[in-house]
Each structure stands twice: as structure tokens, then as C-alpha cells.
Design a protein with these regions (language model features):
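Glycine-enriched, solvent-exposed interface loops adjoining structured elements
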Residues: 1-184
Length: 184
């Protein structure tokens, strides 16, 4: 069984990298981490922006230069309806394998992309990540689910899956809670 441990970890990480879903959902969700921020400048005439390697889910995209503004996310099919030809100041964006804008920028715009990261996979050179460091029970439950499936012990696998779903949702909720005290 121990010879398959790396496989169980790899399989667990496929779950951990998914978007979170409530514990009572029929789907199996992942764990959302603390919001990360990436800054840069949009390139004039280029209507796309590469996603960070650890991107899981968008939180906000803002222009941070002289005129601070938040761009509005729209579904991919809606971006086609909002598409403008030529160049200008983008107002809308969507996400595919890149961030796509409704219009190519007419200038260089400073931006801040706020997003939820996915967990970095464990390896010989990367022995920890934010989930393992903060929520080791989530890793354990996901790995044991796959181990018991491998052993064809469906009852134990179901128990560990239920625990994983509860723990992963709880871990994700930790990052959704307000960070500001409302006083006593």
C-alpha cells in the first residue's frame, strides 16, 4: 500500500485544486486559499492577459493607475455581446485559459488581479503548501479516501470522502470569514 502513496497524494491534489463546493453538494470540491494579488501593466493593443500559474478563482480585477476602477466580470458568451472593436479602456472581462477583455487597451493600464490560488502540488522539492501547513486533516482525508478505494473498501472510502468534503468546505470557509472585528 505504501508504494502507492504518491499516487494517492496526486489523486488527492486533483480534488484540492477544484473550486470549493458546500459539503452537502453531490460534487467534490477543493480548498480555497487566502487571496493573492498580482500586479502589472496591460499592454496597449493586446486584448488578453495571462493567468497566474496558481490561479483557481477570480476575486477582483482593478485598474490602479490615475483612475481606480474595478472591471466587471461577465460570462464568456456575454463578453461577445459587450465586445467593442478597435482600442479603448476595457470595462468588462471574462476568463477562459486567459483573461479576455471587451476591447484591446488603447494605453498601458496598471492593474491588480486579486484571486484565490490553487494548491501547489507536493514533490521532493516542494514538501509543503498552504493546505498541508494549515489543514493537514484535509490532505489526510483525501488520501485515505483514495487508499480505501484502491483497497475496494467502499464503506471506509465513503466515510473518508464525507470527512474530506466537510473538512475542505470548512477550510475554504475560513478564508471567506470577515477579517475585520465588529467590536465587542
Amino acid at each position: 500500500l505504501t508504494s502507492h502513496l504518491d499516487e494517492f497524494i496526486d489523486l488527492a491534489e486533483t480534488y484540492l485544486k477544484r473550486a470549493p463546493v458546500p459539503a452537502d453538494s453531490p460534487d467534490i470540491g477543493g480548498v480555497r486559499g487566502n487571496i493573492q494579488r498580482s500586479t502589472g501593466n496591460l499592454i496597449s493593443g493586446t486584448s488578453t492577459l495571462a493567468l497566474p500559474n496558481d490561479f483557481l478563482e477570480i476575486y477582483r480585477l482593478t485598474f490602479t493607475g490615475d483612475t481606480f476602477s474595478t472591471l466587471r466580470y461577465v460570462a464568456p458568451n456575454q463578453l461577445a455581446l459587450n465586445h467593442r472593436s478597435g482600442t479603448g479602456r476595457p470595462s468588462f472581462f471574462t476568463i477562459s485559459d486567459v483573461i479576455e477583455f471587451d476591447i484591446a487597451p488603447d494605453s498601458t493600464y496598471a492593474y491588480e488581479l486579486s484571486y484565490y490560488p490553487s494548491a501547489t502540488a507536493l514533490s521532493d522539492s516542494n514538501t509543503s503548501n498552504f493546505i498541508l501547513a494549515t489543514f493537514p486533516d484535509v490532505y489526510l482525508a483525501a488520501c485515505l479516501f483514495h487508499a480505501f478505494r484502491f483497497l475496494q473498501d467502499e464503506q471506509s472510502a465513503a466515510n473518508w470522502l464525507a470527512q474530506y468534503k466537510q473538512e475542505s468546505w470548512s477550510a475554504s470557509e475560513t478564508y471567506r470569514l470577515p477579517r475585520v472585528s465588529q467590536g465587542s
